[in-house]
Design a protein with these regions (language model features):
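Short amphipathic alpha-helices and their capping/turn segments at secondary-structure boundaries
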Residues: 247-257, 287-290
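Active-site environment of divalent metal-dependent phosphoester hydrolases
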Residues: 13-15, 74-80, 118-122, 241-245, ...
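Conserved beta-strand hairpin/beta-sheet module of binuclear metal-dependent hydrolase folds
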Residues: 2-64, 215-240
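Short, flexible/disordered intra-domain loops and linkers
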Residues: 35-46, 122-134, 272-282, 307-316
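A short, acidic, amphipathic alpha-helical segment used as a generic capping/interface helix at domain edges
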Residues: 279-292
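C-terminal regulatory/interaction regions
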Residues: 1-4, 13, 279-281, 307-327
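Active-site metal-binding motif and surrounding structural segment of the metallo-beta-lactamase
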Residues: 27, 38-112, 254-272, 299
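Flexible, acidic/histidine-containing loops and adjacent segments that form or flank the divalent-metal
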Residues: 2-4, 61-68, 80-241, 317-327
Length: 327
């Protein structure tokens, strides 16, 4: 059995993170597929080419297969290109992909992770890619609401991150819903023993601050390696600002759920993890969260190169992608 590998793709300020678990299952957290990076005369890293050529080697229905796609929140730098790169709006069990769709290598998503709150509160302020994601989530939810016989097939599965009292979720079975404070090990229709997901947010009630960013999915992923349980503790938080991280610490009684040895800097290493304004002193709660590091922890910034200033030191160099292997 191979080790779990995490690839942070360089998409400037944005997120595209691929987790390849030790059992062969894969998960993509957010996407930013920049069309200009696909041009032959462009030196930017061609993310979609790497995914299709080197990563998504399993096929279903003649399409590259991704076990799970997680959208932390629907800002454009987290879902750019979604509408163009994935097989959407069709039930693959009923409508076979066309030859054109196969030649275009549209990606079939086994299970979609969807947090409905931000979509319902900001429906008029969504990009075309975010609307496309919402439309696909609605299609899958309708299969579960009507108890369609194909609802739990690859390409139709959905995981709701939120609460069942939202109107849109009427009729969705509890098995498809995971709320803040809950842990799951089921992914793409199967229970897994080598890794597990603890959901920290979004919360049921809104908190003060940027209402889009405070609804980001924040989760801890714990993965085993060989005989070591929870050898890797990964935390992803989209664009969650400091108030979210403060409340997470207040609500989490099991402090092991706050531990990390790999932490993606929220909001592309923005000051909003520490304070409302870059001139403000960092909030103590944010500094306390960083103390949850276990061992030789690493923080990854999904951003443009951070230039030297009074807060940061640039360790420099042009990178193709960052890959971390948990052993």
């Amino acid at each position: 059995m191979s080790n779990t590998k995490i690839t942070f793709y360089p998409v400037k300020n944005g997120d595209t993170n691929l987790i390849e678990f030790s059992d062969g299952v894969n998960m993509l957290i957010d996407c930013k597929f920049r069309s200009e990076a696909e041009a032959e005369d462009n030196d930017d890293y061609n993310v979609i080419n790497d995914l299709l050529t080197n990563k998504l080697t399993t096929k279903k229905k003649g399409l590259p297969y991704l076990n799970a796609f997680v959208l932390t929140h629907p800002d454009q730098d987290h879902c750019l290109g979604f509408a163009q790169k994935f097989f959407l709006e069709k039930n693959p069990e009923i409508t076979e992909p066309t030859e054109e769709e196969k030649e275009s290598k549209l990606i079939l998503i086994g299970e979609l992770w969807y947090s409905p709150r931000v979509f319902t509160e900001h429906e008029d302020d969504l990009s075309d890619d975010a609307k496309s994601f919402k439309k696909e989530a609605d299609r899958r939810m309708q299969l579960w609401k009507t108890n369609d016989s194909t609802k739990d097939k690859p390409g139709n599965r959905i995981r709701i991150i939120g609460y069942s009292d939202v109107d849109d979720l009427n009729g969705i079975p509890d098995e498809c819903i995971t709320a803040a404070g809950e842990e799951i090990s089921k992914l793409d229709g199967k229970n897994h023993t080598q890794y597990r997901f603890f959901i920290h947010s979004p919360f049921k009630k809104a908190i003060e601050g940027d209402s889009r960013n405070e609804t980001s999915i924040v989760m801890q992923i714990r993965v085993d390696a060989d005989s070591s349980k929870d050898a890797g503790k990964l935390i992803f938080g989209g664009d969650a600002e400091w108030r979210v991280w403060k409340k997470i610490q207040e609500k989490t009684s099991d402090k092991k759920k706050l531990e990390w040895n790999l932490f993606e800097a929220p909001h592309h290493c923005s000051y909003t993890f520490f304070a409302d304004d870059r001139e403000n002193d960092p909030e103590e709660s944010s500094l306390n969260f960083l103390d949850n590091r276990v061992g030789n922890g690493y923080i990854v910034s999904s951003s443009k190169t951070i230039k030297k200033n009074r807060f940061f030191v640039n360790f420099g160099g042009n990178i193709s992608s960052i890959s971390v292997c948990i052993k």
